[in-house]
UniProtKB/Swiss-Prot annotation:
It is found in: Cell membrane. It comes from Aspergillus terreus (strain NIH 2624 / FGSC A1156). Efflux pump that might be required for efficient secretion of terreic acid. One of its GO terms (molecular function) is transmembrane transporter activity. This is Efflux pump atB. Its main location: membrane. Pfam families: MFS_1. Keywords: Cell membrane, Membrane, Transmembrane, Transmembrane helix, Transport. Disruption phenotype: Greatly diminishes the production of terreic acid. GO terms for cellular component: plasma membrane.
Amino acid sequence: MAPQLAGSSHSSSASDQAHRQSSDPALESGSDTHVGSIAPKTETDFLVSFTGDDDPRSPKHMSSARKWLIVAIVSSTRLGLSPMILAPLSEFYGRKPVYVVSMFFFVVWIIPCAVARNIETLIVARFFNGFAGAAFLSVAGGTVGDLFPKNKLQAPMMVYTASPFLGPELGPVIGNFINSYLDWRWSFYILLIWAFAQWVSISLLVPETYHPVLLRREAQRLRKETGDDRYYAPIEKMDRSIAQTIIRSCYRPFLLLTLEPMCLLLCLFCSVLLGVLYLFFGAFSLVFKDNHGFNLWQVGLSFLGITVGMIIGISTNPFWHRNFMRLLQNHEAKTGTVGSSEPEFRLPPAVGGAPLVTIGLLWFAWTTYPSVHWIVPIIGSGIFGAGVIMIFSGVFTFLVDAYPLYAASALAANSFSRSMFAAAFPLFGQAMFRNLGYQWAGFLLAMITLLLAPFPYIFYRWGAKIRQHSRYAGAK
């Protein structure tokens, strides 16, 4: 948020009116000459800013219902390179233009997917379709931060975190039903209808929330109404170009992955988990078709186990929020500074979720026998799903707090690495399950997550010391 406007806040409508209706000729003419002991105005007096979270112009002042509606829309609309290019544009033009334009092209590129006559057309169309839709992976997190103060961020961030996982799990349920009774092209036709509805919702219901852009609009309004060109917003003083910002956005995530062990290892953990999630698209088809004779739509329903597990993981948020507030209060009592916090306080959900993903994968792996009832491996996948959502919630909020100046780059690094793993794992998933056997393939995945599971706790316990030696993270 920009610095608070000095004095009586010339950005308020009351002071604007007083300024315009003043009977002092010097004031009416825009002169800095004042009578009595009033000091001449400085440039800071014309800085347009919010007076706090309770400022009616601030997105944080919106009603809770409106905030959650915006979160629901931008979270349900949602791979690697696009966020690095599209996200910086929101720093210049705001969130909404990026949403509206990106979603429009997302809708447009679904059409050639639906009418494609060869695989080449489908691949090219899907590439541009994903490129357009990926803007929400990075920009939507910023919208959530625009709407909620820091101490109330965990619940909406949990919903935002869950959205890119609930989609892939509900997709096979809906898609397999469609493909069982209709032509495969109807999967894209229905997606086209849904995406168009989302685009309309974004265009009509989601306002601009990016604070610097809102303040720029306010400064423009004040200049127009008062005729005084000295009013300005901080964003209007930026000396960097769009090209410079995009270039920086493209290379800084790789610097974080290369030079920051915390960012690298947590992004690696998230990437493996998303890769396993996408690998299940092929593995579930093998396990439940071969072992239990499921047809296409029944295989789709088997993904509901992961969905239910994720919903259970989301429902644990009140517990983690209370834990965060307890850590915050203890830290305030220790330091004597009200509102002081540490990024590591965001990691307990990831610490709790790490053993769940390993347990869930082991459960799934060693219950994939024809003699074991089909519900048992599905329960294991649900445990895995609960752990995944808890880990991502903790890691996302930690990255934002640990790299305050480079939060967008940290999330872009996470998005890029996750997208690469999600694209690669399905390519070898079915071959691995066939060659190693269902049990040993699942066991291998569990052991990989076991190797990565200690890192959330390590960074929770010693992260502050590690940050002291970091060039990007905020040191303690």
